[in-house]
């Protein structure tokens, strides 16, 4: 009887000195965490009465030039970003260079009432906000016709003169 399962693929993997209990640990954790935070950017979307709003909390140090917002295929909002990190250390007997590149993107199909020509994007403190306004309509929502409400008639009140007492 073997302790290794016949089809256990992890049993046949080559030994990796940076692997601890099945998870890979980067040799230089600061570079990996910075890159993975950028690549795993979450884009939140919500709808208001006037617009569709998309927000992304980007990692510290991301520049406006690294983020791109565009409308593709008529009604698809595309938010992309690319970041490259290069680290170089020169010693007396060594020269060490590390490079890392990460990208993120989000594609959102916009409804027919989105005005794609007026898309606005702003970035403040690492928070990217993209606003897509809606078409303004002057129509009021139709109120369903209901049965007429009967008029309430108050009973007649007799007018009595109030006599002044002496």
UniProtKB/Swiss-Prot annotation:
It is found in: Cytoplasm. Residues 34-152 form the sHSP domain. Induction: Not induced by heat shock. GO terms for molecular function: unfolded protein binding. Transmembrane segments: none annotated. InterPro entries: A-crystallin/Hsp20_dom, HSP20-like_chaperone, Small_HSP. GO terms for cellular component: cytoplasm. Pfam families: HSP20. One of its GO terms (biological process) is protein folding. Keywords: Cytoplasm, Stress response. It comes from the Eukaryota. May form oligomeric structures. Belongs to the small heat shock protein (HSP20) family. This is 17.9 kDa heat shock protein 2. It comes from Oryza sativa subsp. japonica (Rice).
